[in-house]
Amino acid sequence: MKKTIEIEYVGIEDVWQILEYSRAVMSRGHYVNFSISNPEGIPLVCVKIILNKFINNRNYDYSYEFYMSDKENDFITMNECKSMLRNLLV
C-alpha cells in the first residue's frame, strides 16, 4: 500500500502569485516593495506595503518576510501576505 504525504511549502507559484497581486495593488495607487534575496542559501521574500502612495519618511503599513521553505511559520506568513494583497483588491 502506497501512502501519500502532503507537504505545504512556499513555492515559486506562490511567489509569482504574490508578484501578480502586488502589480494589481500598485495599479490601484498603493506602494508595494517586493524583493527576493538569498541570505542563508534559501530565498527570502520581502513584501512591504504603503497604503495610498509612497511618502518619504513614512513607515510601511504592512510588512511580510518569509523564506521559500516548508516551515509552517513561513507558509502562514505567505498566506497572510496573499490575503492582505487580495483584500486591497476588493
Task: For each feature predicted by the language model, list its residue ranges.
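Short polybasic amphipathic segments
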Residues: 44-51
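Negatively charged, low-complexity tracts enriched in Asp/Glu with abundant Ser/Thr
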Residues: 1-42, 54-90
